[in-house]
Curated annotation (Swiss-Prot):
InterPro entries for this protein: Nudix_hydrolase (IPR020476), NUDIX_hydrolase-like_dom_sf (IPR015797), NUDIX_hydrolase_dom (IPR000086)
Needed cofactors: Mg(2+)
Binding site for Mg(2+): 49, 53
Molecular functions per Gene Ontology: hydrolase activity; metal ion binding
Family statement: Belongs to the Nudix hydrolase family.
KW Metal-binding (keyword) present: yes
EC number from the UniProt entry: 3.6.-.-
Chain span(s) of sequence motif Nudix box: 34-55
Sequence ranges assigned to domain Nudix hydrolase in this UniProt record: 3-130
Knocked-out gene: effects: Cells lacking this gene have an unchanged spontaneous mutation frequency, even in triple mutT/yjhB/yvcI disruptions.
Name this protein carries in UniProt: Uncharacterized Nudix hydrolase YvcI
Pfam families listed in its UniProt record: NUDIX (PF00293)
Length: 158
């Protein structure tokens, strides 16, 4: 049986800019965030992780995506992750240019799809910036992070 890892992240968008983090290992751009601590709520986790990685305190983050990531080697499930993605449009503080996790940079919303990132992340970021409601998704990758399959289920909240 594999252990389910829980992570949170946040897409901070102000005007037409989004703050992203470039991970050093593959050079991929991601929404800042990280692993939840034992007993921590998803909201507390995203606020803490965002501050740790960026120096910024996000104000009133809203949950907009719940995702399952399955890493498979053949028919064997190597690991499973649950990711809770939030959006925010206001914050206090100023971002650092670099943290232990990588380099931080504001990007124009229209340039996001041209950045190097995990194959499924473009779909997630696009919905976070432009979609309405809550997005559920499942992504299956190889251990080398080749995307095997994905499914997205937007849920429009009335």
């Amino acid at each position: 049986m594999t252990y389910l890892q829980r992570v949170t992240n946040c897409v901070l968008q102000t005007d037409d800019k989004v703050l992203l983090l470039q991970k050093p290992r593959r050079g991929w751009w991601v929404a800042p965030g990280g692993k939840m601590e034992s007993g921590e709520s998803v909201r507390d986790s995203v606020i803490r992780e965002y501050r740790e990685e960026t120096g910024i305190y996000i104000i009133n983050p809203q949950l907009k995506g719940v995702f399952t990531f399955i890493i498979k080697d053949g028919d064997h499930i190597v690991s499973e992750w649950m990711m809770f993605t939030f959006v925010a449009d206001s914050y206090t503080g100023q971002n650092v240019s670099e943290s232990e996790e990588g380099k931080l940079q504001w990007h124009d919303v229209n340039d996001i799809q041209n950045l190097p990132m995990a194959p499924g992340d473009g779909h997630i970021l696009d919905f976070m910036m432009k979609g309405q409601g809550l997005l559920h998704g499942t992504f299956t990758y190889t251990p080398e992070f080749e995307l095997l399959s994905y499914r997205l289920d937007p849920q429009h909240i009335k």
